[in-house]
Regions:
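Short, structured coil segments at secondary-structure junctions
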Residues: 92, 100-101
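Short beta-strand elements of ligand-binding domains
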Residues: 75-78, 104-109
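Small/aliphatic-rich secondary-structure junction motif
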Residues: 1-18, 43-50, 117-184, 207-217, ...
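Structural beta-alpha unit
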Residues: 1-74, 187-241
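Short secondary-structure boundary segments
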Residues: 78-79, 151, 244-245
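Conserved sugar-transfer catalytic core signal across GT-A, GT-B, and GT-C glycosyltransferases
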Residues: 91-93, 132
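Glycine-centered tight-turn and secondary-structure capping sites
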Residues: 89-90, 244
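Glycine/threonine-rich flexible loop motifs
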Residues: 84-88
Length: 245
């Protein structure tokens, strides 16, 4: 336990006050130091810099700023001080990206410039993916870099699902569920149909790019969507992924 003198109420109150004061001052000093580094970088780039140092939950205050209407784009790192080997994305980054109403740039490699490799855009036919396409084409034109569009679908999931279900269904239940017919329907209609739909989205994206005077490479990917897209990014050594949220 604590030494006897620290067990006295007055001493404990004093120590709490000292601790709170030191922590508050220390955090302010750390925040100012972060700002100083950013301010110096902006000064070199001849860009204006404004400091925001709100008190509260870090992710909540960042989200609050994105909702203020004062900003168009948020940039933040994928990992922070709590990163450990094997981490892919930090909790602050994940919480902020989920809640941010404005476009968000997530930096995963601070030593690599956007444009040092192709720009990849994810397409699913939605309004937001169309917006992502236009953004990717604009950045690609400005930087003189290739833009690739990908669409991904998972034709393998139902095989896993049906195999799992087959292991627990009785013959009678299988007849009620029309198990074999359902399986055939997925193979012949749903899988092929989804592939055709996503391929058409890619072709429309390619025409949109052509109308804007841009070249666009397209590719239909199969597999777990996040994994298929991530593997493609590695394959082409992409410098930026643009997707709608």
């Amino acid at each position: 336990g604590l030494p006897e003198r620290y067990l006295e109420e007055e001493e404990m109150m004093y120590q709490r006050d000292v601790h709170d004061s030191l922590i508050t001052r220390g955090l302010n000093i750390i925040s100012d130091s972060y700002h100083d580094v950013a301010a110096e970088a902006c000064a070199k780039a001849e860009l204006p810099f404004h400091r925001l140092s709100p008190e509260g939950k870090n992710y909540a205050k960042v989200v609050e700023a994105t909702k203020s209407g004062n900003f168009d784009v948020l940039a933040l790192g994928a990992l922070g001080l709590g990163a450990v080997p094997g981490s892919l994305i930090g909790t602050v980054c994940e919480r902020v990206v989920r809640r941010s109403p404005i476009d968000t740039l997530v930096i995963k490699d601070s030593g690599r410039a956007i444009g040092d490799g192709p720009i990849v855009v994810g397409i699913d036919g939605s309004e937001l993916s169309n917006g992502a396409l236009k953004t990717a084409l604009d950045i690609g034109q400005r930087l003189g870099v290739e833009v690739h569009a990908v669409a991904a679908y998972d034709p393998y999931y139902h095989y896993v699902a049906f195999n799992k279900i087959a292991g627990v269904l009785s013959d009678e239940a299988g007849k009620v569920f029309r198990f074999k017919e359902q399986e055939q329907l997925h193979e012949e209609l749903i899988d092929d149909g989804i592939a055709k739909i996503y391929q058409s989205h890619l072709e429309i994206a390619q025409r949109t790019a052509s109308d804007a005077g841009c070249d666009l490479k397209i590719k239909l990917l199969d597999g777990k969507v996040f994994r298929a897209i991530n593997d493609y990014l590695v394959e082409v050594n992409a410098s930026l992924l643009v997707i709608g949220k």
